[in-house]
Amino acid sequence: MRELPHVLGIVLAGGEGKRLYPLTADRAKPAVPFGGAYRLIDFVLSNLVNARYLRICVLTQYKSHSLDRHISQNWRLSGLAGEYITPVPAQQRLGPRWYTGSADAIYQSMNLIYDEDPDYIVVFGADHVYRMDPEQMVQFHIESGAGATVAGIRVPRAEATAFGVIDADESGRIRSFVEKPADPPGTPDNPDEAFVSMGNYIFTTKVLIDAIRADADDDDSDHDMGGDIIPRLVSDGMAAVYDFSNNEVPGATERDHGYWRDVGTLDAFYDAHMDLVSVHPIFNLYNKRWPIRGESENLAPAKFVNGGSAQESVVGAGSIISAASVRNSVLSSNVYIDDGAIVEGSVIMPGTRIGRGAVVRHAILDKNVVVGPGEMVGVDLEKDRERFSVSAGGVVAVGKGIWI
């Protein structure tokens, strides 16, 4: 087995996630449940741990209690071996202020870097759904001789306004990096696609420290990794791009190779769940060679009684479907669906109860929602807009603990 370089993982998990409201009303975006058994942060942590990067600091800020608890309960590594995944809330080490941006979060947490003294630093976001082997990107970074490496992926040009757009030469050196342009340029071989940043970076340690310090002294900076740090290093000729399509994950299928989803909106979050439910899913949760680790609750198996059924669906542990019909849906743990209820094309989070004869369609129900007997969600959008959030794509989102 090849000896790994000394790498520190920093996961940026302070995102507020306003576009995912109401799912982020009571929790940080990386703590939002996903896929029936996980939270969003589990994907980046699984990728790092599977690659044997076992010294990880998770920088948190916004409503971080459930995120901190999830990490502490479900991501315990061997302290005796010097391994750790530790949530680090804003420490206010530099005065009575919170993080003002992702770069400022690292600046205020520089003691973590000094204590670990790594050769390289992996800085990844905490709110994307994907599999990736970070070791391959680190090796690319080392061989390229760059000071910073940005993971890049092709997306439709119409969607690129939400990302940092990359232009690189044939060797992979980045010539320009524009954060969230109004009119993104297409790629040379396909004008309808753009090459964008995934928000995952590798840095040589000294390069990151110097860039973060310089940014902290710049009063005109927004102190953002994508908006300020990467453009600074691009202008210095120190940044390269790693093409995510070259990343080979053990056990990946042809369908889910290169799968990556930004789930920052209700529609994107919903669509990513629908990617899970087909017989041959676009994203396969069942890859045992690169497992996604999540909640470790000790729950009974799911149960179907009185003719209850689920088709093309994911059903979490502890759930009971009684004489009800579930289709094309993702149910988390401890969901109860009563006699005659119909759930179609929906995402149901832990502890939710759907009453006798109720109908739920094209909806996201957060934790501990109670849908009363005969009630309907996602059937009459005009009525739903008066009481819930409805996305541009017509997805009805019901907040945590609401009784209907």
UniProtKB/Swiss-Prot annotation:
CDD domains: ADP_Glucose_PP, LbH_G1P_AT_C. Coiled coil: none annotated. It comes from the Bacteria. PROSITE patterns: ADP_GLC_PYROPHOSPH_1 (PS00808), ADP_GLC_PYROPHOSPH_2 (PS00809), ADP_GLC_PYROPHOSPH_3 (PS00810). The keyword Cytoplasm does not apply. It holds the Pfam family Hexapep_GlmU. Pathway: Glycan biosynthesis; glycogen biosynthesis. GO terms for molecular function: ATP binding; glucose-1-phosphate adenylyltransferase activity. Transmembrane segments: none annotated. Signal peptide: none annotated. It catalyses: alpha-D-glucose 1-phosphate + ATP + H(+) = ADP-alpha-D-glucose + diphosphate. Keywords: ATP-binding, Carbohydrate metabolism, Glycogen biosynthesis, Glycogen metabolism, Nucleotide-binding, Nucleotidyltransferase, Transferase. One of its GO terms (biological process) is glycogen biosynthetic process. Alpha-D-glucose 1-phosphate binds at residues 99, 164, 179-180, 197. Its EC number is 2.7.7.27. InterPro entries: ADP-Glc_PPase, ADP_Glu_pyroP_CS, GlgC_bac, GlmU/GlgC-like_hexapep, NTP_transferase_dom, Nucleotide-diphossugar_trans, Trimer_LpxA-like_sf. Involved in the biosynthesis of ADP-glucose, a building block, required in the biosynthesis of maltose-1-phosphate (M1P) and in the elongation reactions to produce linear alpha-1,4-glucans. Catalyzes the reaction between ATP and alpha-D-glucose 1-phosphate (G1P) to produce pyrophosphate and ADP-Glc. Belongs to the bacterial/plant glucose-1-phosphate adenylyltransferase family. This is Glucose-1-phosphate adenylyltransferase. It comes from Mycobacterium sp. (strain MCS). The lineage of its organism: Bacteria, Bacillati, Actinomycetota, Actinomycetes, Mycobacteriales.
